[in-house]
Amino acid sequence: MSLLDSLKKFFSPSAPTTPAERAAVEPERVRAAQPLLQPRARHVLCSGPHGLHRVAYTEWGEPTNRRVLVCVHGLTRNGRDFDDLARALAGEYRVVCPDVVGRGRSDWLTDKADYGFPVYVADMVTLIARLDVEEVHWVGTSMGGIIGMLLASLAGTPITRLVLNDVGPVITAASLRRIGQYVGRAPRFADPAAAEAYIREVGAPFGALTDAQWRHLTEYSVRRMDDAEGGYAMVYDPGLGEVFRLNPVPVDIDLWPVYEAIRCPTLALRGAESDLLEPATFAAMGARGPRAQTVEFPGVGHAPMLMDAAQIATVREFLLAGA
């Protein structure tokens, strides 16, 4: 060995080579990664037609990472639906999961007629401005996918890669009627077990989730109430149902002009038993507009929860293909 090689060996920290050495180093690596895998609660102040409101969001990953993934939930859900997906992608992205106004930790609007896509899209633009990035990747489930389509169709959009989870350019009237049957309810539950039974009932189309996943969804779907009635209530504004009552939809909603204006790479996901995204619409999404890649998940209705390994892997592969 030359003198130069000897000096390099002496002054350079050696990598662990034996199993015992690697075992000693690994806990330190795990500890260093832990902050990235812990959710951080944040909020942003937004402006609506009748005043200001706060939109809460959960953030994962390195806070200074310029690669940002925004994950937006369905109509009565919240950003904690994406915890499993966020953990899986926190090493590559700063993952941001908002609670759309009226849900989760976000404020409720005083004028219930303001609940709608103009406010939702404006709030997401404000959120992205707060994140201080020019571009984002987007995963949207159901309503979150519609918000994503609307934003991605605009000139100058910040969305450069789009995942549409069980939603497309045609929203069936039948599915909206089904959703309208429960969205305006304000059920109370005596205990978490009763709440979980309800979540399992209305969430039956989500597919075969584990007991732990159902408990997770329940934990973030209800909160303990301190009023006279007590018990547990859903963490969304029952006033969301007023939109359905005031504006009943007798026919399917056609968003093809919006979809065909999208220019970024797009992945469309569908639960094989979905009543919201019909097979013909799903197939056409692969041929029109951004010509989406299409993946269908068996044994699932509306909507895949992106909690199991296969669903997460599908989303991950598509998103990181653009890295």
List the model feature ranges, each with a label.
Residues 1-69, 91-93, 310, 316-323:
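Alpha/beta-hydrolase fold catalytic core
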Residues 49-51, 84-87, 97-139:
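Active-site loop/oxyanion-hole signature of alpha/beta-hydrolase fold enzymes
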